[in-house]
Amino acid sequence: MWGGGDPARFGIAGGGRFPFSFPHMMDRLPGFRDFYPEPLPLPDMWSADARQYIFGKWRAVARRYGFREYDGPPLEPLELYTLKSGDEIVGQLYNFTDKGGREIALRPEMTPTLARMVAAHERHYKKPVKWFAIPQLFRYERQQKGRLREHFQLNADIFGEADPAADAELVALLIDVLRSFGLTADDFVIRLSSRNAWQDYFNQRCPDAGKAYAFYQIIDKLEREDPAASREKLAQLGFNLDEITAFIQAGEPTVELRGILDNLAARGLRDYVKVDYQVIRGLAYYTGVVFEAFDKKGEFRAIAGGGRYDNLVKLISGGKVNLPALGFGFGDVVLLELLKVRGLLPTFDAAIDAYCLIEDESLRPASLQLVQHLREAGLAVEYPLVAAKPDKQFKRAQEMKAAHTVKWEPAPAGGEPLVRVRNLRTKQEQSLPAAAVAPALATPAT
């Protein structure tokens, strides 16, 4: 439906029928999702109720940690992404030239938008700035398990604090978000690493800084790529896979990592983390501690990931603002699949508080007034939009899992009209004045 406008613009004279028809059933684009309300017709469909459940948990835990919610536009200048990642990222984006001749893209990630926003107005906010968002992100890439061409994501970031205590705070937030869904230390682990340690390793063996990004990309894919292919790529850069494997296995924590581990241990969260230099994060802008969350059974790709990006604000602001920063992203696709497999998604009940029966159409105006009164009292109430037989109305009330039915009773001679309230679970019935109905519906049956 269009939100307004003249139907004649679309060749629909006088609001009539469309002068054309589609030759086939329209479907969504590959890699995109439709979200349906429960109950779902098919088990492989995406649940709007599950999505809202996840959003609710994300928001609740982030707010407990003192994070404030923000948002930004889904379209950004293409340069915002090529500035930090180079032109090669364009192949992964949904980008186009708009009618004003601007090169723009659907956002593939939220961090550059946030860095732009903070750089523009950071002087108005006391540090550290702790913000979160739940954006929808888009990437034109090959679909695979746990990865589509769009997803929603919890982004949580801290600006203006360079101390590792901020890194520990962010990791603790991620742990508690995962725990809020019923996941335990038996289900997931946060793997901590350090880009500083890897940078030292690289600099000691290669004088060509221009090869660093390619090196990090290879390390980031070691677990997913054939060892022979990784060995060859590393050799081309002057590195030896066996030496790198030994460095990873040694796993000696840096000073910053030890500080984070001690901080988390003081919170009772040490069992959820381990140092693992296999994690390096492929994005070019990471500068310090990096981390990823994995399910311990190894059934899924990384659940979440993030780290420090102390130079990004300076880069995006053209050198005008320099703020240390760190953050993580936590997508909904892998999380939903993980919760399904672990049996941790709740049953989403679409039950309503009451269904208003209208068995006498002369009572419809009074019934509508009752419905409105109950809804304004915060109750979920439905009623038949058009005249229907009483048995059909009652069946509809049961289908909607109504806790009660309500209906006006004929007023006795000289008496006050009453509302008949029936509890469909206990089968108890009572007749009440209209003003007493809302409190009665809100009171649990004993």
Language-model regions: role of each:
Residues F22-Y272, Y277-Y285, V290-A302, N311-G318, ...:
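Extended, charged alpha-beta segments that form solvent-exposed binding/catalytic grooves
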Residues F22-M25, E256, I260-N263, R267-V275, ...:
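NTP/phosphate- and nucleic-acid-binding module
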Residues F10, F18-F22:
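Aromatic (phenylalanine/tyrosine) cluster motif
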Residues D6-A8, A13:
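Acidic, Ala/Val/Gly-enriched low-complexity intrinsically disordered segments
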